[in-house]
Amino acid sequence: MKLIEAANYEEMSQKAADIIIAQVKEKPDSVLGLATGSTMLGTYKQLVEDHRQNGTSYRNVRTVNLDEYIGLSPDHPNSYRYYMNQHLFSHIDIPLSQTYIPNGASDDVEAECRRYEQLIESLGGIDLQLLGIGRNGHIGFNEPGTSFSAPTHVVELAPSTRQANARFFPSFNDVPRQAITMGIATIMKSRHILLLASGTAKAPIMAKLFEETVTTDVPASVLHTHPNVTVIADQDALSLVPDEKRKVYAK
């Protein structure tokens, strides 16, 4: 695990975008694993701006998103398909037919999980997976207690996760209770993982992540066992991580 420190959210976003752009330029048909949420907005904004200014092409890129709420149609304003179209896909030259997100409106969500897992394998696996980290350490929607060997599956969302996402919905009760998520095993097959963290709200879980104890109680801790993980975090998110730890991981 390598740590890249950023002064603030804007710098974190730029550094993340630079890594994604480099990946796409090196391998134009890359498979990118993408994430949603407020942490990613700055990165996607930078990718759109770079595409506009420099013409970086995504014509041959394939994307697979981490997760999707169950019960929301793709055109629902709070679906992750809608988020991705609004913030990235509609502003770059990627064909929508090459962008894949679990179908949360499927009549058979268990079959959809199996289909999605097979889809990722058929694409040759994920070259670069973008991740955020939840306040409870979740990655994707893999909540504490999730098996590290889990493939794509249906998950019951923890109350804390639903509360964190309630600001996007009319009320807490409107937040879906279930989602389809790539499993931890699915994520860990990615060739390179890029985890982003910003803000003081993430400081406690980042301190726990850098304690190095690998446990299902902190799903993100499994990343310590992956050979190629880059963490980009701003000073607020790192405020509880001791300087000596930062130095070790910055090398």
From Swiss-Prot:
- Coiled-coil-forming residues are none
Q: Which GO terms describe its molecular function?
A: glucosamine-6-phosphate deaminase activity; identical protein binding
Provide this UniProt record's keywords sorted from A to Z. Answer: Carbohydrate metabolism, Hydrolase
Superkingdom of the source?
Bacteria
Kindly state which reaction or reactions the protein catalyses.
alpha-D-glucosamine 6-phosphate + H2O = beta-D-fructose 6-phosphate + NH4(+)
Name its GO BP terms in alphabetical order. Answer: carbohydrate metabolic process; glucosamine catabolic process; N-acetylglucosamine catabolic process; N-acetylneuraminate catabolic process
Question: What pathway does the UniProt record associate with this protein?
Answer: Amino-sugar metabolism; N-acetylneuraminate degradation; D-fructose 6-phosphate from N-acetylneuraminate: step 5/5
SUPFAM superfamilies, alphabetized: NagB/RpiA/CoA transferase-like
A Pfam match:
Glucosamine_iso
* Top-level class of the enzyme under EC nomenclature: hydrolase
**EC number from the UniProt entry:** 3.5.99.6
Cite the InterPro entries for this sequence. Glc/Gal-6P_isomerase (IPR006148), Glucosamine6P_isomerase (IPR004547), Glucosamine6P_isomerase_CS (IPR018321), NagB/RpiA_transferase-like (IPR037171)
Matching entries from PROSITE patterns are given as:
GLC_GALNAC_ISOMERASE
Gene Ontology CC, one term? cytoplasm
- Keyword Transcription regulation attributed: no
List the active site.
D67 (proton acceptor), N136 (for ring-opening step), H138 (proton acceptor), E143 (for ring-opening step)
Q: Which family does it belong to?
A: Belongs to the glucosamine/galactosamine-6-phosphate isomerase family. NagB subfamily.
Q: Could you tell me which HAMAP family the record lists for this protein?
A: GlcN6P_deamin (MF_01241)
Primary role? Catalyzes the reversible isomerization-deamination of glucosamine 6-phosphate (GlcN6P) to form fructose 6-phosphate (Fru6P) and ammonium ion.
This protein is called what? Glucosamine-6-phosphate deaminase
- Name the gene for this chain: nagB
